[in-house]
Each structure stands twice: as structure tokens, then as C-alpha cells.
Amino acid sequence: METPAMFIKRCSRSIFLQVVIGLVIGVICGVGIPDLAVQMKPLGDGFIKLIKMLIALIVFCVVVNGISGAGDLKKVGRIGLKSVIYFEILTTIALVLGLVVAYSLGLGSGANIHLNELPAGDVALYTGRTQEIHGPVAFLMGLIPTSVFSAFAENDILQVLLFSVLFGSALNLVGEQASGVARLINEFSHIVFRIMGMIVRLAPLGVFGAVAFTTARYGVDSLSHLGALVLVFYATCLVFVMAVLGSVLRLSGVRMLPFLRYFREELMIVMGTASSDAVLPQVMRKLEHMGIRSSTVGLVIPTGYSFNLDGFSIYLTLAVVFIAHVTGTPLAMTDLVTILLVSLVTSKGAHGIPGSALVILAATLTAVPAIPVAGLVLVLSVDWFMGIGRALTNLIGNCVATVTIARWENDIDMPRAQAILDGRLEAPAKADGEPLKRSAVAGEGKLHG
């Protein structure tokens, strides 16, 4: 039987247990002493800001190190193209799934809420920002930073990714003459990852602050009005993860449950903070540790954070149909097709916009005249709770995408990956922040199909 001393010792070594404890204490604090709990918000916000502070640098280091040592630049372009095609297929499946589930269940039907009962002021906060969602040309132009420094200063990950790909490609082409620069960036990455390791140790505190504030602010009762929407959303995400992503992962030779267990610490942090940004560096590190080549991880994960938002895609079509039903708006087949086509465009602008879920939901509703935009206010009270499901599904989707594309490219050491997922090889033992050396990532350089 485990003694208290043994449990404390185990907790001191396990970020996962520390995060669970932080989450439980946060709920207790939020319910028991809400006045104090609402003041804990800076702990969660501060933790996420600390993580975001290093994301651009980590993406730069991982991508440059990966591409500069990748050898064949045609392979890098091939990975990028395959990633975009994969993302488009999977997000389309997610959008269709959300649409079909909401429509077939009649989600929200019978509520009989009249438009004049809805407070327009809250809606205006989000509809007034729909101009932030750009068209395809403006989006592509937005990938090009005004300067290298502005990309890093504004923490625009896609702009940083573009510069990193160009910089890494140039290092690759210059070759031996630039070996000193490549070595310097590699050594710099050790420092950045060490800082990240220090920050990750604060995860339990960040989760405690975020959960305590949310429980005190919204309360468990806030789910009661829109419980059906929340439950159907989570059930749909679960079906998508286990059936769709599970099948994709299985085709790559990996089982979903061991895969989820491998990322349990990161999933717990996302559950507490409702932000997948908070674990991006750790996830990239763990995927490399599984045996995936760093250049593949560095290209797929940052791109996926903007183009492969499976959880958000489910939420978008589910919420649009729910609002239509709850306001008594009849939907013809042409309306459903319009919702799907509009969502395919608007869903690609979600990452990087504050309050992006509600802003893009407003943009989608605005583009579908049959549905009243005022219905947006109906999902405001449960948006945070649904945000947890969005972030979890987005994260799992991007991890699965990385494994799948690495498998297509023979960029994964499968014996090593299976050994780690089966528990025969240990996962990174602690958040020490050390980047993984190439030999540790790819089985001394030998990759297996």
C-alpha cells in the first residue's frame, strides 16, 4: 500500500499528477470560496503568456534545425503539400460531421426563443470584429511579415514559420560555409528548451488559477441551460477522435488509446487552460521523442495550428445549426450547403485572433443571411466549456496528422514509436526542456517504414 510519503514523492516527479491536483483544488476553491477564486485568473493568464513568449523561438529553432539537416529540399515541399491536403480533408469531415449531427438531432429545436429577447450588446462585441477574418488573397499576403522582427514581435506563428522555412532552406543550400550558424542555432535551441522546461513546471499553478476563476465566474450551473449543446458537442468530438482520427492513426500502425496516454500531461494542461498553445513546445518535443524526424514535426505542427482545427470545425457547424433551430429559422438544403461552404473558408482564420471562436462564428452567421446573427449570444455562457473540447480535439488532430504524414514519408522510427507507446521505452522523464538530438529522434538515423 502506498504511504503518504511515497505519494508525495511520486507527485514531485509527475507533472501529470501535479496538474490533476491543481485542477481539483481549483474546482474546490471556485465552488467554496468564489470571491477569492476570481482573483486567481492572473495565474492562468500568466502561465499561458509565459508559454507564448517562447513559441516563436521554438518554432524557429525546430524548423531551421530540421530543414538545414534534412538534405533534400524537395522532400520539405512534398511534406508541406501533403500536410495542406490532409488538413483540408480532415477539417471538411469535421465540418460535415458537426452539421449532420446538429441537423439530424434537431439540436435546439423547440426552444422558441424570440429575437427581441436576445441582448444585442453582447453580439455587437463580436460582429463588429468580423472584418478581422480575411479573404484568401489577404490571408496569403498576411503570411508575409513587414519585417522579420515584426513576425517575432507580434508572435505570428505562420509568418515565423515562413521565415524559418526560408532561413533553414538557405542554410541547407549554403552547406558547409554556414555550419557555424547552424551549430549556433542548435546550441541556442538548448537554452530556449531549458527555459521552457522551467516554465512547464508552473503548469499546475496555471491550471489551478484558470480552473478556480472559471468555476467561480460561471459556476457548474451555467451548463444547465445549454446542456444539450455542450453534451452533443463533446459526444461528437469523442466520435471524431475515436472513429475518424482513430482509424487514420490505425492505418499508420498506431493505436489511439496508448497514443492518448502518451500525451496525458499535455491533455490535462489543455483541459485546465482551454488553450492548445500552452502545450505546443512539449508536444513537438514528445513527437520527436517518438521517433519522428524534427523537420516533419516542425512543419506539420505549426501549420496545423492554423489549418487543422478539427475541434473548432465541429463546433462551428454545430453552433450555427443550433442557433438556427433555437431561433426557429427553417433550414433548406441550400442553406446547409451554404453553411458548409462558408465554414470551409472562415474556419481557416481561427488561430491567432483573440476570442476567435465567437468572432468567426459571427462571421459565418453574417455570411448566411437566413440565420439571425443575434443568436450568437445564446452560446456565450458556455463558450469557455466548449473551448476545452475544441482545444483538446485540435491538439489530438494535429498530433495524429504529424504521425500520419511522417508515416507517409517514412520519417518515423516505428519500432521506437511502438516501444514508447507500449511502455517498453520511457517517455521524457521530466520537463527538463532539453531538445532531442537527431540520433535519439530517428534511431541513430535509420528510419523504418
Curated annotation (Swiss-Prot):
Pfam families: SDF (PF00375). GO terms for molecular function: fumarate transmembrane transporter activity; malate:proton symporter activity; succinate transmembrane transporter activity. The keyword rRNA-binding does not apply. It is a multi-pass membrane protein. It is found in: Cell inner membrane. The chain crosses the membrane at residues 14-34, 47-67, 83-103, 157-177, 195-215, 226-246, 312-332, 359-379, 385-405. Belongs to the dicarboxylate/amino acid:cation symporter (DAACS) (TC 2.A.23) family. Responsible for the transport of dicarboxylates such as succinate, fumarate, and malate from the periplasm across the membrane. This is C4-dicarboxylate transport protein 1. It comes from Pseudomonas aeruginosa (strain UCBPP-PA14).
